[in-house]
Structures are given as C-alpha cells and as structure tokens.
Amino acid sequence: MDRYEQVTELARRRGFMWPSFELYGGAAGFYDYGPLGARLKRRIEDIWRRFFVIGEGFAEIECPTIGIEEVFRASGHLSGFSDPLTECKECKEIYRADHLIKHIVEVPDALSAEEIYRMIKENDITCPECGGELSEVYEFNLMFRTAIGPGNRHPGYLRPETAQGMFINFQRLLRYYRDSLPFGAVQIGRSYRNEISPRQGVIRLREFSQAEAEVFIDPRNKQHPRFSEVKDLRLRLYSREAQERGQVEEMSVGEAVERGIIAHEILAYFVARTYEYLLAVGVDRERLRFRQHKADEMAHYAADCWDAEVLLDRLGWIEIVGIADRTDYDLRSHMALSKANLSVFVHYPEPVRRKRVAVKPDMKVLGPRFKGRAKAIADALQAMSVADLKGDTIKITVDGETYEIERRLVSVEEIEEEIRGEYVVPHVIEPSFGIDRILYTVLEHSYHEEPVEDEMRVVLRFLPGISPIDVAILPLMDKDELVEPARRIFDEFRRCGMLAEFDTSGSIGRRYRRNDEIGTPYCITVDYQTLEDGTVTVRDRDTMQQIRIEADRAVDIIRDLMSGALCFSEAGMPVKS
C-alpha cells in the first residue's frame, strides 16, 4: 500500500472524505467531506481569509455558480475552455490525451490536438485498459451546460472558475473602493469542470472549491508598497531557464525580481504570500516549489504566471495554486461585449499642462443645419486628426450615414490645457487556490507512521490551528465520578469557542491512537488524581509526552499551546512514563 492509499483509506475510515453517491455506485469526480474533512476544509479556508481578507484588506463577495452565456462568451470559455480527448476504438474508454504522454513531455498542455495525436502514434501508445488503438485527438469543452428557465432560449453554464463574478462586478467594486486603484476582491466557492477522466481522488474533481483573489492595479505601476516585508523570503523557484537545466534554484524574492525571473514586485509579492499561506496550513516546505509557465504554455494575454506545485507520493508534482499577471485581458474582453466602461480615471500627483491641436467645428452653422444630429457629427469631426482634414470637403460617417462637411466649417487651433489624470484599464493579478488539492496535500504531508510498542502508530501531524479537533477530553474510565468532571471541562472548552471532542469508548491507549490518527494535538485525561488535587494530564500528540496541569486552567493553557505562546515542556509538571 503506497502513501496515497494509506491517506485515502484513513480519510474514509476516520470521516475526512469519501466518494459521493456511494449508495448508488458513485460517480467519478465527486467527493463528500465528512465531519472531520468539513472542519479541516473550513479551517484551511478561514486561514486563507486571514491572509487575503484581513491581511490584504480585500473585499469578499459571493456570486451565483450559474452564469449566463454572454459571460463565458466574453471570457473565452465558450470557445477555448477545452481539454484534448481520445477514445479507445475497442473498449470505448475515454482518456485525456495529454495525460497519456506525460512520461514523454514534461508539460504537454502547450501541444495542439494534432501534435498530441502524432506523439501517441510515434510512441505506439495504446489504450491503458485493453491495449486497443486510440482515436484521433479532439477538443472537448469542459463546461456544464444548463438552461435558465423553461425551454432552451436562455442557455447558462455552471461556472468553471469564481473569477468571472469579480470581473462582472468591477464597476460596483470600484465604487466600493472610492474609485481608486489598487484594490482586490476575493471569492471562495464551488466551480465546475466536466473533466474527461477524473481518476485521482480530490486532486481532479468535476465539482471543486476555489479561493481566488483578483487584484486590480494601475498598469503603469507594478511596484508593491509592502514588498520589503517579503523580499528576503527564500523560495524554491523552477523558472523557465531552470526547467531547461532540470534543476530548481533557491533564492530570495528580492533577487528573483532583480534578475527578472519574476516579472515585477506585485506578482512576486503574491508568490511570497502564497508561500507563507501554504506553510501556515501545513504544506511541507521541502516538497513545495514554484514553477514558471513556459512561453508556449502561458496564455497569450498573460505577462507572467507561476504555479505553486507540491510533491505527492504517487502523483508527483501537482499544481495547487496559480499566480498570474493576466494584464487587462479580462476587463477589455467584457468591455468589448457588454459595451460598458470598465476603465478607471487615475489622478496625477500634480496636474500637468500640455499643448495639443484641437479640431473645432463651427456649431453656429452645423447646429441649425443638422439639428439633433449636430452633436454626433461634431464629435466625429473632433475625433479626426489634422491629417484627415484635406480638400474642400470632409466625409464622415455617423450611425451608418455619410455626411459631407465643407472644410471651411472646421478650424484647427493649438490649445493649452490642464491634465489632471488619465483613464486606464486596470491589469489583474490573480492568485487562484485549489482548496481540495491543498486539503489533500495537507493530509499527505502530515501523515506519519512510527513503530511504538510492537505496533505501527499512525499520526496526522497537523499544525495546531489546522487540526479539525483542538483537544480531546478523555475520562480514564467510563465511570460517573470521572465522566462528570470531564464533562465540565469539555463544556468549558465549547463555551470558549474551541473544537473539543468527548470520548469514553475503549481503553485510554486506544483513544490516544484514535486521536493521533485524526490529528488531535492534545488529549486531556481526567483520572482519579483529578478527584484528589484538581489536576489533569495533557498528552502531546507528536512527542506522546504528558504533563499535569490544574483543570481550572486547561482552556487557557491549551489555547496558549496552540498559539505558540507556551512551550509544552514548560506548561506543567512532567509525568513520568
């Protein structure tokens, strides 16, 4: 049994997660989170909010998971959101074609369907299931289609990402931020992709959770005011050049920007914050790297893009976060289709005076002549360059109708004007987090086995703030004189907002092992000494050491242990084993 099987078996058995619809045989690409998994997921999301909503001051919004067709036409999902697919001609099994050549090409995403099929043929790749011949590769759109209302007049789609809701709400968000850049919006929620062959547990799902931030910035200024906070962080970077050599480089964030490895300070800042967040939820630093997209795999509109990748036992390096400079693509795409103005007026620090040549129509003549059409005609004339004002007459087209205007009715003057700012279409920096993938990574990176007393102890070494249970309250025996004081301690933890578990079933050793397996950092045992002197034992999950503390101080001590304000060995009197 490899580590992936060990983790997924533990997750099912202990109530973290399991395949959906088990009663009816299940469906690939869907997973349910059990009691412990739902708690773990919520804590991962809450720490994300602590970083990006509280730490960065970004506004959290919530948008529908169904979108109208126009949204995805503008975003490009209708025409370009697809994966390459191939089908076995014998058994009819369907595969994602680029996954079949991963052992040949490190990043097959950049290849066209034709190139992938050629590699399949050249390398004699056959159906993994039956060895049959594979069909030609074709593109399969990954969006789930539905209808909004009865009939098919108003098609809709389950959103493939949370990001579009933030772009659609740009004008309202801009107003919320008092018409000034930069600002950010975040959303945590469900997204949907009709994956071709989801076979990797929660790593590849058809319904999954995302946490995304869209940071709207002035395209002329890509420096970050808080860059000094992260510039000395050392990251393991797998840049395009490093990928050519096949060797990860470790360097500071500041050096990466100075050398032009990461495009600019703002992008580097969010790469660094992503690193800090992933460590805060329990991702192993030694199994974490940031890989830069190669030029041929990066979206044509992107300026730079980095993926946070983690090393998993069975699956190798897997992307769990993407951090991209998407330039102004998203807002310009929605501007083009919606005709809405998604630009921002950015004030200069000081007004500047500029001279320019202005075209001035003679409205005393044009007004009476064209009446209601005069303003539109004048606007069209003013938009013309001086070079276009040649000849005795000027031809212009307004609303599909052509007009001839005498040249003498248009004058050209040099004017000086005060310019207080200019309109810009913001660029977008997008850190996009796959919550389900992060959760599985935390499970696998926290999983440890060690021999203890002729048996193998399994322990999930969650960080204290991540564990789905903060503390377990365990009466030494299921007897009233021990259960009642234990229950009072349990109730006090609950009143203080801490997640406590009360357990009387089985021997105390068995209960310790059970809490090791689910990652509970501390177990409090109420024994007969408690009845004599009011003290209880506290057991540390990772070291299995025990101390005695006063029962009345249990909540404060556990809280300080979890926050790191108190060291376990100094929190009470050691218990001799």
From Swiss-Prot:
Keyword Protein biosynthesis: yes
Full protein name: Glycine--tRNA ligase
SUPFAM superfamilies per the UniProt record, alphabetical: Class II aaRS ABD-related, Class II aaRS and biotin synthetases
UniProt cross-references to PROSITE patterns, sorted A to Z: AA_TRNA_LIGASE_II
GO cellular component: a single term: cytoplasm
HAMAP family the UniProt entry points to: Gly_tRNA_synth_A (MF_00253_A)
GO aspect biological process, one term: glycyl-tRNA aminoacylation
Molecular functions per Gene Ontology: ATP binding; glycine-tRNA ligase activity; protein dimerization activity
Keywords: Aminoacyl-tRNA synthetase, ATP-binding, Cytoplasm, Ligase, Nucleotide-binding, Protein biosynthesis
EC number: 6.1.1.14
InterPro entries: aa-tRNA-synt_IIb, aa-tRNA-synth_II, aa-tRNA-synth_II/BPL/LPL, Anticodon-bd, Anticodon-bd_dom_sf, Gly-tRNA_synthase/POLG2, Gly_tRNA_ligase_arc, GlyRS-like_core
UniProt entry tagged with the keyword Cytoplasm: yes
Residues annotated to bind ATP: 193-195, 203-208, 319-320, 434-437
Gene3D superfamilies noted in UniProt: 3.30.40.230, 3.30.720.200, Anticodon-binding domain, Bira Bifunctional Protein, Domain 2
Native organism: Methanothrix thermoacetophila (strain DSM 6194 / JCM 14653 / NBRC 101360 / PT) (Methanosaeta thermophila)
Broadest EC class assigned to this enzyme: ligase
Binding site for substrate: R96, E161, F208, S209, Q210, A211, E212, E430, P431, S432, F433, G434
